Structures are given as C-alpha cells and as structure tokens.
Amino acid sequence: MGQASKVFGKQITYSVSPFQQKLFVNYFKNAIPHLRRGVKDNFFCSVPYFAALYITVNWANETYHNEMKDHWY
C-alpha cells in the first residue's frame, strides 16, 4: 500500500498517502455489533444511574406541577 517506510531501532513505521486510504472502512458494518457488546458489557453499571435520574426527574416534575396547581389563580 505505502512505499515510504522508516526503521527506528526495532520499530517500523509506514506512511500511507491520504489518497490511498479509505475513509470509515467497515465502520457501519461493525457499528451494530460493537454497540450491542458495549451495552451488554456496561448494562449493570449504567442502569442504576439512569434509574436514579428517572426517579429524580419524575419527582421534580410532579412537585413542580403540584405547586403550580396550588398557585392557580
């Protein structure tokens, strides 16, 4: 693919022209499996936070609407 290469000790680096690269190679093909795996791996870590957020927002909305009913002219 790329012709230019440099050797620094035991590390070999290759440089590729921007015209030889493909943008988002297999990005959309691999996005759904990666998303599914990420949700599955982090499900039990993130659910308590979303549950606490839902309970807090629900309580705040209910309190706000009850106060608005009391102050109705």
Curated annotation (Swiss-Prot):
Q: How does it sit in the membrane?
A: Single-pass membrane protein
- Record's GO cellular component, any one? mitochondrial inner membrane
Q: Which Gene Ontology terms describe the biological processes this protein takes part in?
A: mitochondrial electron transport, ubiquinol to cytochrome c
The residue spans the entry assigns to the Mitochondrial intermembrane side of the membrane are as follows 61-73
Keywords, A to Z, come to: Electron transport, Membrane, Mitochondrion, Mitochondrion inner membrane, Respiratory chain, Transmembrane, Transmembrane helix, Transport
- Record's Gene3D superfamilies? Cytochrome b-c1 complex subunit 8
Q: Where are the transmembrane segments?
A: 43-60
Subcellular location(s) of the protein: Mitochondrion inner membrane
Presence of keyword Transport? yes
Which stretches of this protein does UniProt put in the Mitochondrial matrix compartment?
1-42
Describe the function of this protein. Answer: Component of the ubiquinol-cytochrome c oxidoreductase, a multisubunit transmembrane complex that is part of the mitochondrial electron transport chain which drives oxidative phosphorylation.
Assembly, in brief, is: Component of the ubiquinol-cytochrome c oxidoreductase (cytochrome b-c1 complex, complex III, CIII), a multisubunit enzyme composed of 3 respiratory subunits cytochrome b, cytochrome c1 and Rieske protein, 2 core protein subunits, and additional low-molecular weight protein subunits. The complex exists as an obligatory dimer and forms supercomplexes (SCs) in the inner mitochondrial membrane with cytochrome c oxidase (complex IV, CIV).
Indicate what this protein is called per its UniProt record. Answer: Probable cytochrome b-c1 complex subunit 8
